[in-house]
Amino acid sequence: AFFRRQRQMCIRDRLKDKRFDAVVTAPVQKSVINDSGLSFTGHTEFFSEQFGCEDVVMLLVNHGLRVALATTHLPLREVPDAITQESLLRKLEIIHNELMRLYGISQPRIAMLGLNPHAGEGGHLGREEIETITPASEEALRRDIDVTAPIPADTAFTSKQVLDADVVLAMFHDQG
């Protein structure tokens, strides 16, 4: 009951009135919340539902490193189907626009990770990079969004492309 009252107060009395500019969330044990009788997948889904906003991006920020997620809290087996060219383009547009608006970055650089090991190894370890992720990055470039082709996630965070980026777009929750 306490959690329910607090979240409603936060939404109704603070965010919708624009009394706060941002919300910082901390990790929570979702199973405890769900075991109490409340349905709770995560903060991102909660705020999306409260504000009636279908297109959302989870952004993790820590000391100059920003990581956005293409999907939210999904079982790993559902991730490939959730990643479409259209959904990636929408995420890239949101990230691009919000980095300009919130951080004053005039031309945000986005490093996009691949989904499969080694970014699919040219189709030998999965075709999502070839069929979905690369076409999305190519279309985003045509829309003047500065994004890389899929980068292998296993070495991404040591890559100069990622270190020089304003944000990394990971394909799923624990990849980011």
Predicted segments with their positions:
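Single conserved hydrophobic/aromatic residue that forms the stacking wall/gate
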Residues: 1-7, 11
